[in-house]
A protein has these predicted regions:
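Terminal presequence/propeptide segments associated with secretion/organelle targeting
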Residues: 2-5, 10-725
Length: 725
């Protein structure tokens, strides 16, 4: 039977006429199709230039893997958010050199510090639609694990051919639930160094209390530099390396940013869920996300308790703590907005209309009916697995996770590279090595034991038919044990392992399967014991995943065709690929507190919020040098008369999500005016349902960053390099 589909460009053409003006995270190749909307919004440059990834400005935008950055000098200097560089700041911090607290500035190139092991910059250079290669006639006829394996095999083949061009990293990304696929090629820069980060009192001002909150006063910026080998090609860290020379970099705005101005953001948004089915929405907000939030809240409290009074422990757990707090508050915001909304009712009504349309013609029913029905039962299977296994990531000791990864490396290395598990091929070994290398700088045994014992006790209290006997046996536990007895058993496991030693872990990367099986290390033994069951679960997930991919892609195709029949827009959910969103600088009336939210905050708000180191957990503790400069009204050229101060953060109608952090916010001339770093708490529900009245993104105003760098931190070298006079 012939498959009917619309290309991404065709979908964009529909969207140009029907989407909300500021809604959508657009692929660069789609932008010429929405040129009229971009021009109407205020873009001065030719929209066609935005589709060329090797031209200005897209050639200046890079992925950090979970965050975005952009080149701002010809010497590979890149700016991103402070919270995106937090892991590298933490990795280089010690109690006697507390970069987290005091900040960091490299006065010379030689002073720039290696970022955390495994840090990368990826510059997207090409995108290719490979849907027909992935979903060829043979693969379309398959289901279950066979389908999953066939898709993975084709992906590996495409990636291997793409990566024959040395120095590049290639990946295949799925769109519309596996209906369409893109092969994305990126230059991989492997030597990344920390150049500058402001003090926590600037870069994290407001802390968790102000996270997802407006008005905001956070200097969320830091600088990296990309380095390459003497031959100009990507290379591992070496003192002989030299700064990378990007073909394009962004320039600071030559004109002031004002309310109502056009802005656009280029970045790598991680994930949205706007095309999810009603049953998925119901499960997410009815059980999964509330449970995740509860568990994360408990983990946050445990980490605080176990590291209290131990600065070394606080530093080691800082990156994990930041991530937990950020996601925890995000989930809370989503839940609060969902509970007071009609999102589920609207999703059900939309799905009922889709099913009625499918059943309204014999041809459509034959084409889509089976997939629509199958998706419902398959999603129910996945939900049952999630309920049983949600605690797994929280209850597993870090050293056991490490041991399982090490043993899997040994198992996969014995196979031909093309047959190895995705993520464990030769191309992945540097990433795996870096993960093992960084563990001890982010591992605190006291805290790790407490987390494991606490959540293992919860797991063992689940109904017996939901427990995995292999997991229970690997720990030497029994159902019904209390936390104290679990802790006693864990003490034996930790004492019987040497994996907390970096040299020991790194040595295991080069050992074979026989060495693992002969080991008496407690966590290595547990990893070996769990291996067969881990593969059983992997095959279970592949079987379900293959069935679900087939059905879900069919549902997405039905959804696309249904909306196309009505002349309505459909764009792909975010999936960590390069996208552009556009909008304008705009406040909100009313805000969540009932007041009018003005589009800009200023330095006055920092002074008003400042509480010092001993109140509010030290989250509102601006540096003394900064407060003195504000009091003296030493504003220089960054003073804005209409604000009678220097702008700090601003609101816009940009459509963004996690992964956009660090993304450059550009004006109509593609000049840098800010860095995207957050959204408002009631608008995080936009990941599931877009509401133009609510959605506001929060960005750092570049004028605040430049004021802090010039007036307080005196980073003259960097300002000169960026061409700031």
């Amino acid at each position: 039977m012939k498959r009917h589909s619309l290309s991404l460009l065709a979908l964009a053409a529909l969207a140009a006429a029907t989407a909300h003006a500021d809604e959508g995270m657009w692929m660069p190749k789609q932008l010429p199709q929405i040129a009229k909307s971009l021009k109407a919004g205020g873009l001065a440059m030719d929209p066609a230039k935005l589709k060329d990834l090797t031209d200005f400005p897209m050639g200046a935008v890079v992925s950090l893997g979970g965050c975005t950055a952009s080149f701002v000098s010809p010497q590979g200097l890149a700016v991103t958010n402070h919270h995106c560089a937090y892991g590298s700041i933490q990795y280089n911090s010690k109690p006697d050199r507390d970069l987290l607290k005091n900040g960091f500035y490299a006065a010379t190139l030689a002073d720039e510090l290696p970022a955390a092991p495994g840090s990368r910059m990826w510059v997207t250079v090409d995108l290719k639609d490979v849907s027909t290669e992935i979903l060829n006639d043979k693969t379309r006829a398959l289901t279950g694990k066979a389908r999953t394996d066939a898709i993975e095999a084709t992906e590996k083949s495409l990636v291997a051919a793409c990566e024959a061009d040395k120095g590049h990293r290639c990946n295949v990304y799925a769109f519309f639930g596996g209906l369409q696929y893109q092969l994305i090629k990126q230059l991989e820069i492997r030597d990344v160094r920390l150049v500058h980060a402001p003090a926590t009192g600037v870069g994290l001002f407001g802390g968790d209390a102000d996270n997802w909150v407006w008005p905001r006063h956070t200097g969320d910026y830091s600088f990296y530099r990309a380095y390459v080998g003497p031959d100009g090609k990507p290379a591992e860290f070496s003192k002989d390396n030299k700064p990378y020379l990007p073909k394009h970099h962004l320039k600071m705005a030559s004109s002031p940013l004002n309310a109502g101005d056009f802005v656009m953001v280029a970045g790598y948004p991680g994930r949205t869920d706007r095309h999810r089915l009603p049953t998925e929405v119901d499960f997410a907000f009815g059980w999964q996300q509330p449970t995740q939030a509860r568990v994360m809240g408990e983990a946050i409290d445990l980490i605080k308790a176990e590291t209290a009074g131990r600065r070394d422990g606080e530093i080691k757990m800082a990156a994990r703590m930041q991530g937990l707090q950020n996601y925890y508050k995000n989930l809370q915001g989503q839940q609060q907005s969902y509970d007071g909304s009609d999102i589920l009712a609207r999703k059900k009504a939309e799905f009922d209309k889709l099913r009625a349309w499918v059943n309204g013609s014999p041809e459509r029913k034959a084409r889509y009916g089976a997939d629509v029905a199958a998706a419902q039962s398959l999603l129910a299977e996945r939900e049952a697995i999630t309920r049983a296994e949600l605690l797994a990531n929280f209850m597993t000791p870090a050293l056991l996770t490490s041991a399982r990864q090490l043993y899997l490396v040994a198992q996969e290395r014995a196979k031909p590279d093309a047959e190895r598990k995705s993520g464990y091929q030769e191309r992945d070994l540097p990433r795996l090595r870096a993960a093992q290398q960084t563990l001890d700088r982010r591992y605190d045994e006291q805290t790790d034991k407490r987390l494991a014992s606490h959540f293992l006790a919860q797991y063992l209290a689940q109904p017996a038919n939901t427990l995995n006997p292999a997991w229970v046996d690997a720990y030497g536990l029994k159902t019904g044990q209390d936390e104290a007895s679990i802790r006693a058993q864990l003490d034996k496991l930790y004492a019987g392992s040497k994996l907390s030693d970096t040299a020991v872990r790194m040595a295991w990367l080069d050992k074979d399967v026989a060495a693992f099986k002969a080991s008496d290390d407690a966590f290595i033994k547990a990893a070996v014991a769990l291996y067969d069951d881990d593969r059983r679960l992997e095959n279970r997930d592949k079987e379900l995943g293959g069935k679900l991919q087939k059905a879900y892609a069919g549902v997405q195709q039905a959804m696309i065709d249904y909306h196309a029949s009505r002349g309505e827009a459909v764009y792909a959910d975010a999936n960590s690929t390069l996208r552009i969103s556009y909008g304008k600088v705009e406040g909100r009336n009313p805000g969540t507190d009932g007041s009018t939210w003005t589009p800009f905050t200023t330095l006055r708000g920092i002074v008003a919020k400042h509480k010092g180191p001993d109140e509010a957990g030290g989250e509102f503790n601006a540096p003394a040098e900064q407060l003195a400069a504000i009091k003296a009204r030493n504003f220089g050229k960054y003073y804005v008369k209409g604000l009678d101060s220097v702008p700090v953060n601003f609101l816009s109608t940009l459509d963004t999500t996690g992964g956009n952090s660090g993304s450059p916010v550009l004006n109509k001339n593609a000049e840098l005016v800010g860095l995207l770093f957050d959204g408002t708490l009631d608008a995080v529900i936009s990941d599931w349902s877009f509401d133009p009245k609510m959605v506001r993104s929060i960005s750092l105003d570049a004028r605040y960053m430049l004021w802090q760098m010039s007036t307080v931190d005196k980073t003259t070298r960097l300002l000169d390099e960026m061409g700031v006079k």
